[in-house]
């Protein structure tokens, strides 16, 4: 009898372990279907950073916040924010190009736009025109347009309204635009405490889809202190949002330690988002992620405070 009991217990353990293993495999498969490897698995280039400020007494001694990279006709184009080094120094717009996404040449007449504080920019090309959404002074988003990506025209500050048409006071920054089926969408943050979504017909006046954030901070430590969107990508029928987060809600205090992270979330409707269970997607204090398709694979760049390159695993 004793031997039979022992055999029974052993069989029960085997069945239990098999069930647990099957459950883990099922969960892993579900994650990989929602977050394909191309979207989340990257390894750092072995000679980072690939771009940085001048580190001498120039207008772009340092770079900060999100820059943006597009690849067009085999050439990489980068827009970035430069400043002399003090947080209160105005931030101006720089431009650089590359044929391989590694070796960059700064435009000889930088800064290409210095009429207004311009940082944390997002660039999208629609038709024959480039649109840039950028933070101005005091985190007020403004719009610029260009035909060639170099010469920009200021179009004014954005106006964002609640669902009840009440104007939202500043700040509203880290703007990220998405254009689909004739409709413009804008993701933005307010003091990095959440990510909101609005739509517009004229690119200046925007109305919230809902007055609650579509992405909230937390609950995991990697984005418990702050969140802000950098980019939206559509891949195999799903939307992937690349965003940065902070571990510390007091990140603005220079005396506090705050780790900035690069993260991903997925949606099927731009409103309801599921965060990647294995966030953050890169190690260390590297944030403001931008995904670029090089013609064969996706590569990831983190833009703050130097530009790091990551390739697909």
Features from the language model and the residues they span:
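Hydrophobic transmembrane signal anchors and adjacent membrane-proximal interface regions, especially
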Residues: 2-3, 235
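Carbohydrate-active catalytic/glycan-binding domains of CAZyme proteins
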Residues: 19-313
